[in-house]
UniProtKB/Swiss-Prot annotation:
Sodium/bicarbonate cotransporter which plays an important role in regulating intracellular pH. Has been shown to act as a sodium/bicarbonate cotransporter in exchange for intracellular chloride. Has also been shown to act as a sodium/biocarbonate cotransporter which does not couple net influx of bicarbonate to net efflux of chloride, with the observed chloride efflux being due to chloride self-exchange. Controls neuronal pH and may contribute to the secretion of cerebrospinal fluid. NCBIfam families: ae. The keyword Membrane applies. N-glycosylated. Residues 530-537, 583-595, 647-719, 783-808, 876-911, 956-997 are extracellular. This is Sodium-driven chloride bicarbonate exchanger. The chain crosses the membrane at residues 509-529, 538-558, 562-582, 596-616, 626-646, 720-740, 762-782, 809-829, 855-875, 912-932, 935-955, 998-1018. Belongs to the anion exchanger (TC 2.A.31) family. It comes from Bos taurus.
C-alpha cells in the first residue's frame, strides 16, 4: 500500500473503456477523427459565427438523430483501435474535440449548462462516535476552505493545483466508473447504482459493498450547522421546502428543476444489456439478497425513516444562498479513506434530471453531478487534492460546459486535456503553493477556448476592432419629415410605464436627494449672476421657476430622461452680451431675448424635422472626452474659485500680534470723500450724513450706507471675520473627502453587504446631512444657501409673460434670427454631446435613446421660457454623468471573491422628475434650506467634477507620460498602438482642450460652440496622422459613406469561404499542417510520453494482472 504514489489506484484498471454507462437518450459519440461529414459540421457552424439557434428545431432533431448513428459507428472504430484512450491521432487536439463537443445540439434541456455550486465533503472517523461527512471546501467561482479551527470559512482565493493531482484525476476518469444521465430520486438509489456497477465490473468486492454503502449514506455535516438547528423558524421552512421538493411532481423554486417521479428509476445498462428500467432483479446480492432495484412507496418511506434526523431541520445559510444564482445546480465531491478497502473506488455521476437530495449539499438546490473517491488508509491528502482538482475543474467555464454535454468518458478526458493545455505552471522553487492568491478584479473571457481557429490563424470570434459607438438605428436618416422623431416616440413609448415602476428602489431615492442638493446651488447661483448681469430682470426666482418647469417637462416626455438639464456658461456669456447691446441701443432686453428664443426654438425644430441629429455619429470619443473633460475641469475650477472668493467676504488678519489683541477694534465712520453715487443715494433716501450715529451701526448697516471701517481689526473693505474662512475650508474639504469615502464604502470590509450598499448609495446626501449638523452644532456663521422666499418676479416692472416685439422696432423680430443661429449651434452641441456621452454603449442602456425627441423637448421649453422671461436650460454634462453614475446597477448575486458585475443603469424618469418638482417647491422650504452651508455645496461640486473624470480615457493617457513602460497599466490600446502614437494623440487632444479653455474664460466665450464643432473637423484631419486601425483603438472610427458597401463585401467574402468547402467531407484547417508547426502540440499525446503518466499506466497494468489471478466474487447479472 505504501510502495508507490499511484498504488491506491490499482483497482481503476478493472473498468475498461468499452464498459461505458449507457446514456439513457441513445448513442454516444466520439470526435477523435477530424474527417467530419459536412452535415455534421453545419450543426456546429452556428456556434463558430456566434448566432444563437433555438434548441429543439425540426432540423436540429433530424440532424441530431442522423449524427447519433454516425457517432456510434465512430465509437466502434475508435474502440477497436484506441481501446484505452491513451493515444489519439496527432492532428486531433483536445481543443478541437472540446470545441466540437460544445457545438453539439441537444434535443432536450437537460444538457443546457447551469451555474454550479461545488462542495467537497470528506468522511471523518472519530473514536466513540459515528462517522460523518464533513464539508471541507466549497466553490462558486473561487475556492473557500474550512479553516483548521473549523469555526470559519477562509477568504475566497484562486485554487492552485498540483500537476500530479490533475494527472491522477485524469486516470480516475479514464479508468473509473462513469455514469451519465442517471435517473435517481435519492442518494441511496445513486449509491445502489454506483456500487452495482462497481461490483459488476469487478472494481469492488461484493463482501465490502454493504460497508461502502453504509459509508456513503452517513450523515453530512456542513460548516453552517450548529448544535441548535431549530432556533430560527425560517430555517425550518427552508428544510420543509427541500423536503417537499424531493417528493413526486414537485418543482425546485431555485433551479426550476422537476424532481423525478416515483417511477422505477432508469439506470445504465450492464454489459449483458439488462435494462434497469424493465427489471427489478437483485443488483444487491452482496447485501444479503435484499431487494434494492425496485422502489415502492413503502420502500421509499423506510429509507426516509432511516435517514439522519438532523437533515429534516438543518440550518440554511441565507446569506450564502443570496450569492447563488437562480437556476444553479450542485456538484458534490465525496472523498475519504475507509479502513476496510484495499482498492480505490472512483465514480463520476451525472444525474438527469437534477434532483434535490436532502442534506447532501450545504444549500437546498438540486444536485447534478457527484464524484466519489474512496480508498484505503494512508492517502487522505492525495484524495483531498484530487477532490480539489475535480471541484476546480467544475468551476472552469469550459470544462463545466463539457461536463454537461459529454456523451462518454472520452469527452470528459478531452475536457481535462484541454484544461491542462491552458493551465499556467508556477515553478516550485519560486512560489509557495500554500500562499493563497487573491481573486482578480477582472477575469479574462474564456470564449476563445470555445471557438475554433479559421484558416488565417485567427479566432472566428477573436478581438474585433472596435467600431463607432454611435452608429445605432437611432441615428440613421429616415429620409422622411420628422421620421427620426416618430421612430424615437415608437421606441420609447413601450417603456413609458416601466420608466416609473423601475424607480421603486432605495437607489433612486438616494440619487434624487443627492442631485436635488447638487442642482439647487448652481441654479440659484446662475440666477444670481444673471440678476447682476441684467439688473434684476432675470434673477434667482426666475431661474428656479424655469429650471423646475423645463426639467419636469423634459423628465416626463424626453427621449433620455437620465439627462439632467441645467444652466451653462456660454448661455450666461450670451445673456451678458445681449443685455449690454440692448442697453447701448435703447432696446427692450426681454422682448429682443424672446424673439431670439423663439427663432432658436424654430430652428431646433427644423433640425428635428430634417433628422439633423444623425450628424451626432460624427461626434467621436475624441470630441466627447475633450468636451466632458472641459466641463469637469470647469466644475473643479469654479468650486475652488468660489472657496477663494469667500476670503474677500470674510477676510482674515494676516499680521496678528497676540500682545495687541486688547487694542484691536473696528469702527464704522463717515466716508471722507463720498462718491457721487453715494451722495445721490443719500439724497434719494433723504439721509443726512451728519444725522447718522456711525459708531452704533452694524456691519450690514455700515456697508449699505457706504461707511468706512477704521481700526486694527479692519480689512480693506470689511472687518476681519474670525474663523469663518478657515471653517469654510474645513467644511469644503471634509465634504469632498467624506463623499468619496462613503461612496467607496460598498467595497470596504465592514458591516453587511446591504448596509454597505445603502451607505454607498446615500453617500453624498449623508455627507451633506452630516456637514449641516456639524456646522449647526459648532455655530460659526458660515455663508448659507439663500433661496427666494416669495414666488413673484424679481422686478415689479415685469410680469410672467413677455411679448416678442414689445417697445422694440418691428425689424428687431426679423434681425433676431442672426444671433438665433449662434444660439442654435450652442444648444445643439451642448445637448447632443451630453446625450452622446450618456448613451454610450459602456452604460449598457436597454431602453434606447431619443436624440430627436430630446432636442424637440429642449426646443419647445426654450420657446416657452423665452415668452415667460425665464433662463434657458440645456443638458448639463457633469450633472448628467453624476446622475448616471448614481444609478449604476451591479449584480446582487456574485460568488464570494468575485467582483460584482456591472449590469447597466436603472433607466427611469422618476429621479429627474422629483428633482425638479422639489426644486420648484424650494420657495416654500427656505426655513430648511437656509441651514445648508455654501462651502458644503462647493465641495459637492468639486466631488462631482472629480468623480466624473473617472473612466475618461484621456486622463488615463495623460498619466502615461510619467510612467515607465514596465509600470504602465495593461490598457487594450497599448497592445495595438505604438506608445509614441498614443502620446501624439494625447498631445493633440490636450491642445484642443487648452484652446477650448482659453476661449471659455475669455471675452470670446460666445464662439465656444463653434470651437466645439471645430473639434469634429480636427478629428477628421487626424486620419492623415494615424492609420485607421490605430484610430479604431484610440478613438471611435468616423462613419464613412461606403460603410454599408464594405460590410456587404465582408459578408460576401465570408459566405464565399463557406461555399468553398466540398460537398463530401470537410477537413479541419490544422490537418496536414500540424507536424509542420512545432508550436502546435497535442496535449493528450505529449502527456502520454511523460514519466509521470507512464508510471500511472504501469501501476494500472500491474493491477490488471493481479486482479486477473483473483477474480471477483460477484456473480454475473
Amino acid at each position: 500500500m505504501q510502495s508507490g504514489t499511484c498504488e491506491s489506484f490499482q483497482s481503476l484498471s478493472h473498468q475498461r473503456n468499452d464498459e461505458e454507462a449507457v446514456v439513457d437518450r441513445g448513442g454516444t459519440r466520439s470526435i477523435l477523427k477530424t474527417h467530419f461529414e459536412k452535415e455534421d459540421l453545419e450543426g456546429h457552424r452556428t456556434l463558430f459565427i456566434g448566432v444563437h439557434v433555438p434548441l429543439g428545431g425540426r432540423k436540429s432533431h433530424r440532424r441530431h438523430r442522423h449524427r447519433g448513428h454516425k457517432h456510434r459507428k465512430r465509437d466502434r472504430e475508435r474502440d477497436s483501435g484506441l481501446e484505452d484512450g491513451r493515444e489519439s491521432p496527432s492532428f486531433d487536439t483536445p481543443s478541437q474535440r472540446v470545441q466540437f463537443i460544445l457545438g453539439t445540439e441537444d434535443d432536450d434541456e437537460e444538457h443546457i449548462p447551469h451555474d454550479l455550486f461545488t462542495e467537497l465533503d470528506e468522511i471523518c472517523w472519530r473514536e466513540g462516535e459515528d462517522a460523518e461527512w464533513r464539508e471541507t471546501a466549497r466553490w462558486l467561482k473561487f475556492e473557500e476552505d474550512v479553516e483548521d479551527g473549523g469555526e470559519r470559512w477562509s477568504k475566497p482565493y484562486v485554487a492552485t493545483l498540483s500537476l500530479h493531482s490533475l494527472f491522477e484525476l485524469r486516470s480516475c476518469i479514464l479508468n473509473g466508473t462513469v455514469l451519465l444521465d442517471m435517473h435517481a430520486n435519492t442518494l441511496e438509489e445513486i449509491a445502489d447504482m454506483v456500487l452495482d456497477q462497481q461490483v459488476s465490473s469487478g472494481q469492488l468486492n461484493e463482501d465490502v459493498r454493504h460497508r461502502v454503502h453504509e459509508a456513503l449514506m452517513k450523515q453530512h455535516h456542513h460548516q453552517n450547522q450548529k448544535k441548535l438547528t431549530n432556533r430560527i423558524p425560517i430555517v425550518r421552512s427552508f428544510a420543509d421546502i427541500g423536503k417537499k421538493q424531493s417528493e413526486p411532481n414537485s418543482m425546485d423554486k431555485n433551479a426550476g428543476q422537476v424532481v423525478s417521479p416515483q417511477s422505477a428509476p432508469a439506470c445504465v445498462e450492464n454489459k449483458n444489456d439488462v435494462s434497469r428500467e424493465n427489471s427489478t432483479v437483485d443488483f444487491s446480492k452482496g447485501l444479503g439478497g435484499q431487494q434494492k432495484g425496485h422502489t415502492s412507496p413503502c420502500g421509499m418511506k423506510q429509507r426516509h425513516e432511516k435517514g439522519p434526523p438532523h437533515q429534516q431541520d438543518r440550518e440554511v445559510d441565507l446569506h450564502f444562498m443570496k450569492k447563488i444564482p437562480p437556476g444553479a445546480e450542485a456538484s458534490n465531491i465525496l472523498v475519504g479513506e475507509l479502513e476496510f478497502l484495499d482498492r480505490t473506488v472512483v465514480a463520476f455521476v451525472r444525474l438527469s434530471p437534477a434532483v434535490l437530495l436532502q442534506g447532501l449539499a450545504e444549500v437546498p438546490i438540486p444536485t447534478r453531478f457527484l464524484f466519489i473517491l474512496l480508498g484505503p488508509l494512508g492517502k487522505g491528502q492525495q484524495y483531498h487534492e484530487i477532490g480539489r482538482s475535480i471541484a476546480t475543474l467544475m468551476t472552469d467555464e469550459v470544462f463545466h460546459d463539457v461536463a454537461y454535454k459529454a456523451k462518454d468518458r472520452n469527452d470528459l478526458v478531452s475536457g481535462i486535456d484541454e484544461f491542462l493545455d491552458q493551465v499556467t505552471v508556477l515553478p516550485p522553487g519560486e512560489w509557495d503553493p500554500s500562499i493563497r492568491i487573491e481573486p482578480p478584479k477582472n477575469v479574462p473571457s474564456q470564449e476563445k477556448r470555445k471557438i475554433p481557429a479559421v484558416p488565417n490563424g485567427t479566432a472566428a470570434h477573436g478581438e474585433a476592432e472596435p467600431h463607432g459607438g454611435h452608429s445605432g438605428p437611432e441615428l440613421q436618416r429616415t429620409g422622411r419629415l420628422f421620421g427620426g422623431l416618430i421612430l424615437d416616440i415608437k421606441r420609447k413609448a413601450p417603456y413609458f410605464w416601466s420608466d416609473f415602476t423601475d424607480a421603486l428602489s432605495l437607489q433612486c431615492l438616494a440619487s434624487f436627494l443627492f442631485l436635488y442638493c447638487a442642482c439647487m446651488s448652481p441654479v440659484i447661483t446662475f440666477g444670481g449672476l444673471l440678476g447682476e448681469a441684467t439688473e434684476g430682470r432675470i434673477s434667482a426666482i426666475e431661474s428656479l421657476f424655469g429650471a423646475s418647469m423645463t426639467g419636469i417637462a423634459y423628465s416626463l416626455f424626453g427621449g433620455q430622461p437620465l439627462t439632467i438639464l441645467g444652466s451653462t456658461g456660454p448661455v450666461l456669456v450670451f445673456e451678458k452680451i445681449l443685455f449690454k447691446f440692448c442697453k447701448e441701443y435703447g432696446l427692450s432686453y426681454l422682448s429682443l431675448r424672446a424673439s431670439i428664443g423663439l427663432w432658436t426654438a424654430t430652428l431646433c425644430i427644423i433640425l428635428v424635422a430634417t433628422d439633423a441629429s444623425s450628424l451626432v455619429c460624427y461626434i467621436t470619443r475624441f470630441t466627447e472626452e475633450a468636451f466632458a473633460s472641459l466641463i469637469c475641469i470647469i466644475f473643479i475650477y469654479e468650486a475652488l474659485e468660489k472657496l477663494f472668493e469667500l476670503s474677500e467676504a470674510y477676510p482674515i488678519n494676516m499680521h496678528n500680534d497676540l500682545e495687541l489683541l486688547t487694542q484691536y477694534s473696528c469702527n464704522c465712520v463717515e466716508p471722507h470723500n463720498p462718491s457721487n453715487n453715494t451722495l445721490k443715494e443719500w439724497r434719494e433716501s433723504n439721509i443726512s450724513a451728519s444725522d447718522i450715529i456711525w459708531e452704533n451701526l452694524t456691519v450690514s448697516e455700515c456697508t449699505s450706507l457706504h461707511g468706512e471701517y477704521v481700526g486694527r481689526a479692519c480689512g480693506h473693505e470689511h472687518p476681519y471675520v474670525p474663523d469663518v474662512l478657515f471653517w469654510s475650508v474645513i467644511l469644503f474639504f471634509s465634504t469632498v473627502t467624506l463623499s468619496a469615502t462613503l461612496k467607496q464604502f460598498k467595497t470596504s470590509r465592514y458591516f453587511p453587504t446591504k448596509v454597505r450598499s445603502i451607505v454607498s448609495d446615500f453617500a453624498v446626501f449623508l455627507t451633506i446631512l452630516c456637514m449641516v449638523l456639524i456646522d449647526y452644532a459648532i455655530g460659526i456663521p458660515s455663508p448659507k444657501l439663500q433661496v427666494p422666499s416669495v414666488f413673484k418676479p424679481t422686478r415689479d416692472d415685469r410680469g410672467w409673460f413677455v411679448t416678442p416685439l414689445g417697445p422694440n422696432p418691428w425689424w428687431t423680430v426679423i434681425a433676431a434670427i442672426i444671433p438665433a443661429l449662434l444660439c442654435t449651434i450652442l444648444i445643439f452641441m451642448d445637448q447632443q454631446i451630453t446625450a452622446v456621452i450618456i448613451n454610450r454603449k459602456e452604460h449598457k442602456l436597454k431602453k434606447g435613446c431619443g436624440y430627436h425627441l430630446d432636442l424637440l423637448m429642449v426646443a419647445v421649453m426654450l420657446g416657452v421660457c423665452s415668452i415667460m422671461g425665464l433662463p434657458w436650460f440645456v443638458a448639463a454634462t457633469v450633472l448628467s454623468i453624476t446622475h448616471v453614475n448614481s444609478l449604476k446597477l451591479e449584480s446582487e448575486c456574485s460568488a464570494p471573491g468575485e467582483q460584482p458585475k456591472f449590469l447597466g443603469i436603472r433607466e427611469q424618469r422618476v429621479t429627474g422628475l422629483m428633482i425638479f418638482i422639489l426644486m420648484g417647491s424650494s420657495v416654500f422650504m427656505t426655513s430648511i434650506l437656509k441651514f445648508i452651508p455654501m462651502p458644503v455645496l462647493y465641495g459637492v461640486f468639486l466631488y462631482m467634477g472629480a468623480s466624473s473624470l473617472k473612466g475618461i480615457q484621456f486622463f488615463d493617457r495623460i498619466k502615461l507620460f510619467w510612467m515607465p513602460a514596465k509600470h504602465q497599466p495593461d490598457f487594450i490600446y497599448l497592445r495595438h498602438v505604438p506608445l509614441r502614437k498614443v502620446h501624439l494623440f494625447t498631445v493633440i487632444q490636450m491642445s484642443c482642450l487648452g484652446l477650448l479653455w482659453i476661449i471659455k474664460v475669455s471675452r470670446a466665450a460666445i464662439v465656444f460652440p463653434m470651437m466645439v464643432l471645430a473639434l469634429v473637423f480636427v478629428r477628421k484631419l487626424m486620419d492623415f496622422l494615424f492609420t485607421k486601425r490605430e484610430l479604431s483603438w484610440l478613438d471611435d472610427l468616423m462613419p464613412e459613406s461606403k460603410k454599408k458597401k464594405l460590410e456587404d463585401a465582408e459578408k460576401e467574402e465570408e459566405q464565399s469561404m463557406l461555399a468553398m468547402e466540398d460537398e463530401g467531407t470537410v477537413q479541419l484547417p490544422l490537418e496536414g499542417h500540424y507536424r509542420d508547426d512545432p508550436s502546435v502540440i497535442n496535449i493528450s499525446d505529449e502527456m502520454s510520453k511523460t514519466a509521470l503518466w507512464r508510471n500511472l499506466l504501469i501501476t494500472a497494468d500491474n493491477s490488471k494482472d493481479k486482479e486477473s489471478s483473483f477474480p471477483s466474487k460477484s456473480s454475473p447479472s
